[in-house]
Amino acid sequence: MKKITMNHKIIKKALLIRNVEQAFLDLFSTGNLNGTVHTCIGQELSAIAFAGQLSKKDFVFSNHRCHGHYIEYTNEWHSLVLELLGKKDGVCGGIGSSQHL
């Protein structure tokens, strides 16, 4: 098992996840997202710890609060935003939304 320590990189990633999640809540509250959105605000570090134990050969099946897992595992957030906006360049072609990544 890999040793996990709190460092600048972990804190920076947790803040990135928090900011993306807050942006989703803001978009949802103004009616700019279809369906619903389930954030992982307050659970950012669990996503980072979880993904830190995986290899690129692993398959990930998450729950309905999966944005943090996605961001940490893929190391990107742009296609996640496009997905929740219903755009074809989203991670699931814009049809998966928040719950089906």
What is each of the regions a protein language model found here?
Residues 22-25, 32-101:
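Cofactor-binding active-site loop characterized by glycine-rich and histidine/acidic residues
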Residues 1-34, 56:
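Cofactor-/ligand-binding subdomain signature composed of acidic, glycine-rich
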